[in-house]
């Protein structure tokens, strides 16, 4: 199973790239973590946010391979602790499909992305900066994998 993070935004600060790479490189070859960046729509004083969300959503969904499970990252989604995320990871593996996790831009995800999702995950009730979310996601998914693999990274 392959895990994809499909995220709005490019040209992240160096610390974000390094943090993400640190965790993504740790994944086993049979479960790689891939990051796909979608350029953010131009936002200005009089920007049409609904149109920007629509275009970003179309671009995100266009990168999802047919048959992939789509999971959105959204504040009203379901919150999982590490054990529950590990159970989700096991469930996704048994499903036999690759998983695409959609991370929206500053205004979130388009209605089309939300409608296409089989699951919605809330990372936190806090509002987090989108660059930081990439690092937190990579670490959380790696930690969940370590639980499923009985790897010593995670300690109770």
Swiss-Prot record:
The subcellular location is: Cytoplasm
Q: Cite the GO molecular-function annotations of the record.
A: rRNA (pseudouridine-N3-)-methyltransferase activity
Look up the EC number in the record and give it.
2.1.1.177
Instruction: Report which reactions are catalysed by this protein.
Output: pseudouridine(1915) in 23S rRNA + S-adenosyl-L-methionine = N(3)-methylpseudouridine(1915) in 23S rRNA + S-adenosyl-L-homocysteine + H(+)
Q: Which CDD domains match?
A: RlmH-like
Q: Which of UniProt's keywords are assigned here?
A: Cytoplasm, Methyltransferase, rRNA processing, S-adenosyl-L-methionine, Transferase
Q: Which residues does S-adenosyl-L-methionine bind?
A: 73, 104, 123-128
- By its UniProt entry, which SUPFAM superfamilies does this protein fall under? alpha/beta knot
Q: Assign the protein's first listed, main location to one coarse class.
A: cytoplasm
InterPro entries attached to this UniProt entry: Alpha/beta_knot_MTases (IPR029028), RlmH-like (IPR003742), tRNA_m1G_MTases_N (IPR029026)
- Membrane-traversing stretches: none
> Gene Ontology terms, cellular component aspect?
cytoplasm
What family is reported? Answer: Belongs to the RNA methyltransferase RlmH family.
Q: Which PANTHER family match?
A: METHYLTRANSFERASE, RIBOSOMAL RNA LARGE SUBUNIT METHYLTRANSFERASE H
Quaternary structure annotation from Swiss-Prot or TrEMBL: Homodimer.
What HAMAP family does the record point to? 23SrRNA_methyltr_H
What the protein does? Specifically methylates the pseudouridine at position 1915 (m3Psi1915) in 23S rRNA.
What is the protein named? Ribosomal RNA large subunit methyltransferase H
* Species the sequence originates in: Photobacterium profundum (strain SS9)
